[in-house]
Curated annotation (Swiss-Prot):
Binding site for ATP: 8, 11, 91, 137, 140
Cofactor detail note: Magnesium is required for nucleotidyltransferase activity. Nickel for phosphatase activity.
Binding-site list for Mg(2+): 21, 23
Encoding gene (name): cca
Catalysed reaction equations from the record: a tRNA precursor + 2 CTP + ATP = a tRNA with a 3' CCA end + 3 diphosphate; a tRNA with a 3' CCA end + 2 CTP + ATP = a tRNA with a 3' CCACCA end + 3 diphosphate
One example GO MF annotation: cyclic-nucleotide phosphodiesterase activity
Organism the protein comes from: Vibrio campbellii (strain ATCC BAA-1116)
Cross-referenced HAMAP family: CCA_bact_type1, CCA_bact_type2
Protein name: Multifunctional CCA protein
Additional observations: A single active site specifically recognizes both ATP and CTP and is responsible for their addition.
Organism ancestry: Bacteria, Pseudomonadati, Pseudomonadota, Gammaproteobacteria, Vibrionales
Domain notes per entry: Comprises two domains: an N-terminal domain containing the nucleotidyltransferase activity and a C-terminal HD domain associated with both phosphodiesterase and phosphatase activities.
Binding site for CTP: 8, 11, 91, 137, 140
Chain's role: Catalyzes the addition and repair of the essential 3'-terminal CCA sequence in tRNAs without using a nucleic acid template. Adds these three nucleotides in the order of C, C, and A to the tRNA nucleotide-73, using CTP and ATP as substrates and producing inorganic pyrophosphate. tRNA 3'-terminal CCA addition is required both for tRNA processing and repair. Also involved in tRNA surveillance by mediating tandem CCA addition to generate a CCACCA at the 3' terminus of unstable tRNAs. While stable tRNAs receive only 3'-terminal CCA, unstable tRNAs are marked with CCACCA and rapidly degraded.
Highest taxon listed in the record's lineage: Bacteria
Amino acid sequence: MQVYLVGGAVRDHLLGIDIYDRDWVVVGATPEIMLSQGYTAVGKDFPVFLHPKTKEEHALARTERKSGAGYTGFECFFDQSVTLEEDLIRRDLTINAMAMDEDGNLYDPYGGQKDIDAKVLRHVSQAFVEDPLRVLRVARFAAKLAHLGFSVAEETMQLMRDMAESGELSTLTPERVWQEWHKSLSTSRPDVFLSVLRDCGALAVVLPEIDALFGVPQPEKWHPEIDTGIHTLMVAQQAAKLSDSLPVRFAAQVHDLGKGVTPESEWPSHKMHCHTGLKLIKKLCDRVRVPNEFRDLALMVCEQHSNIHRAAELKPQTIIKILNKFDVWRKAERLQDILICCQADHAGRKGLEDQPYPQAELFMRAYQAAASVDVQAIIKDGFKGPAIRDEQEKRRAEAVKVALGK
C-alpha cells in the first residue's frame, strides 16, 4: 500500500501559499486493510478513512464513470488494482491532478507543474464535461489565483461554454451554487468568479439576476464605465479591497440588482432601483439558500445606498430614520459594514477608484452623536411610556444637527 498527498495541498505547496487542508490517496489497499491499521471509515458513497493520529482524510484510489445527469450522476469503482494515474485523471484541473509521496517525490502525469509555471487553469481530460459543478469550481479557482496571474485556458473555457449551452448546469442544486459562490467571496478577487461565469455563459443560468445587469447603461456623468454589469464587477473588487467580511462582499455584488429590471424607456436613469432591487435580492437569496446574515445586510445596502451617497443633503431626522432602519442601537457594527459597501459602490467607477468618500465619516459622526443621547436623562426629566421614545428621537436628531453643523 502506497500513500500520496494529492490535489490542492500539492498545488499550494508548489505555489508557495498556505496549506489549510491535506487530502491523501491510498493505492493498493482495501477497506479491510485500512481498518486493520487503525483508520476510521467515514465515506458513504466511496471509501474514505480518517488517519488514526492526524485525522486527515485518506481515500482509496478510485475511478469514476458517468451514469446519470448532473454532478451526482457517477458510479465509483475502487480496488487494489486502481493506479495513481487512474485516480488523478478523474480530477478537474491539471494543477489539482498532482501527487507527492511520503519522500517528497512529485507525480505529475498530466502537466500540472507546467501549467502552474504558465499560470494556466486547464482541464485534465474530456471527462471534465461530465460534472457541471466544475464550471463553478474553475471560476472559483480563477478568483483564488487571480492575484498570481492565473487565467482559464481557452480550450477549457470552450468546454465550459459547451456545458452552459447544454443545459447540464440546471442540475446543480441551489446549495452547491451557494457553496461555490460563498467560497469565491473569501478569495482576493471575488469579481473574477462572476466574470469567468459571465464569459462562459454560466452566469445567466446560475445567477441570472446578476447576468441581467450586463448591457444595461447608467448615466455617464456618474458612471464613466456606463455598463451596470461592469460597474458591479468593479464594486465587487473594491469591496474585497476594503473588507474581509463575506456578507459585505456579497452585499456589494447584489446592491444594484434593481437596475436589471428598469424599463428600457427609462434608461440610463434608474430612479426606482433601490426599491425594485429588494424583491430581486429576496428571490435570489431564497433560491440559492443564502444565510440571513448575508441577505439582511444586502437588503439594507440596496435600499439605502443612494441616500447614504447624498448624506450631506439629508435632514437630521432622515438620518435618524435610516439609523433606526439599520437597528444600529443594538447592532453598532452593522453601520460600518453598510458604509463600506457604499464606499465600494462609490469607488467602483472607471477613473474614480481613489476619489474620497466623506459620506462614510459624516454618517459615522452622526451615529456617534445620536448614540450619546442618554435615555436615563429623558426618564429623569419626567417622560413616560411612548413619550420616552418620541423625546429620544428628538434629542438624537438635535445631537446630529449640532454634530454636523446643520
